[in-house]
């Protein structure tokens, strides 16, 4: 029976997460992972065929990290339920800049030429339904408002992640409420 691997996929993914959080995903390569794990590159390529396979699995892992961030944010902040996603998105851009850039700028899997394309992305339809219910509008109207809110929020988050904007949570919350009140009459 061969010896049990000392370096697991979980250890590799945690290490890639650490490197990405500190230096950005561009700093991730087999050597940087191996150096941080204090091993050769061989265990990495025992677990993964190549770096592309690792990147693909890491994107899912990083998105789960983001989902946990949103859940933790929801539990720690007292605000309107319809503002949790936009506020947590902007906070993630501020707190986890390198992960935000990876997930929502560089590798964002969104190709929009029409409004309906936004709802082809996994999860957006369900989020829009929950949002519509929380603001008390019909689904089609809620989807239009949710998309507008996303585009507005994404702009603020990108400006935050690139260091161009440094509003505190109260200011951002006020801006989002103003936007929503303009749409919900």
Could you describe each region identified by the protein language model?
Residues 1-23, 27, 32, 53:
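Basic, helix-initiating cap at the start of DNA-binding domains
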Residues 20, 54-62, 70, 103, ...:
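Alpha-helical DNA-contacting segments of helix-turn-helix folds
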Residues 22-25, 38, 45-55:
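HTH DNA-binding helix-turn interface
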Residues 57, 71-98, 149:
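Hydrophobic alpha-helical connector segments
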Residues 70, 110-137, 141-147, 174-184:
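Amphipathic alpha-helical packing segments from all-alpha helical-bundle domains
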Residues 91-132, 158, 162:
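Short secondary-structure transition hinges
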Residues 102, 150-168, 182-185:
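Amphipathic C-terminal alpha-helical segment
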């Amino acid at each position: 029976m061969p010896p049990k691997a000392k370096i697991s996929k979980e250890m590799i993914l945690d290490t890639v997460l650490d490197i990405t959080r500190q230096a950005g995903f561009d700093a991730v390569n087999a050597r940087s992972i191996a150096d941080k794990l204090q091993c050769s590159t061989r265990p990495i390529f025992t677990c993964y065929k190549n770096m592309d396979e690792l990147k693909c699995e890491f994107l899912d892992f990083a998105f789960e990290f983001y989902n946990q961030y949103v859940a933790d944010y929801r539990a720690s902040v007292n605000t309107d339920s319809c503002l949790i996603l936009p506020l947590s998105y902007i906070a993630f851009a501020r707190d986890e800049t390198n992960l935000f850039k990876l997930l929502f700028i560089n590798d964002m899997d969104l190709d929009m030429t029409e409004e309906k394309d936004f709802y082809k992305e996994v999860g957006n339809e369900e989020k829009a339904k929950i949002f519509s219910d929380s603001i008390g509008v019909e689904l089609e109207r809620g989807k239009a408002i949710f998309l507008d809110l996303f585009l507005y929020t994404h702009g603020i988050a990108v400006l935050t992640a690139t260091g161009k904007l440094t509003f505190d949570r109260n200011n951002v919350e006020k801006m989002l409420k103003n936007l929503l009140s303009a749409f919900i009459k």
